[in-house]
């Protein structure tokens, strides 16, 4: 496992909710990342409790997260070490109530 992969692995495993995105929760840099943050807020997640990783600040992470998850796009959500998906999957899961259940006790 490369250093970047190890760094990603530690972020995913050591934080309950991790969103790899473009920008930050307070200033998303793309519509999909912004939508992902809004979905999490709608689920009751306090953005202070949310770990976000701005992939625009680190090309290694930007490419590495795609390899780590075998998923080609950003944003990517992880809850308790499990890859959930991008903003489209998050929206589908939110609309069905499944995302709220997955997040569960982590909502603030």
How should these model regions be labeled?
Residues 4-6:
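Eukaryotic intrinsically disordered and solvent-exposed regulatory patches
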């Amino acid at each position: 496992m490369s250093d970047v992969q190890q760094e990603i692995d530690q972020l995913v495993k050591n934080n309950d909710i991790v969103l790899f995105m473009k920008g930050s929760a307070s200033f998303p840099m793309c519509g999909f990342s912004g939508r992902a943050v809004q979905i999490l807020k709608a689920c009751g997640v306090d953005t202070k409790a949310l770990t976000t990783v701005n992939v625009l600040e680190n090309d290694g992470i930007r490419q590495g997260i795609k390899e780590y998850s075998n998923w080609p796009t950003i944003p990517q959500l992880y809850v308790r070490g499990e890859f959930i998906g991008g903003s489209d999957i998050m929206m589908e899961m939110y609309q069905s109530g499944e995302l709220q259940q997955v997040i569960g006790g982590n909502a603030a």
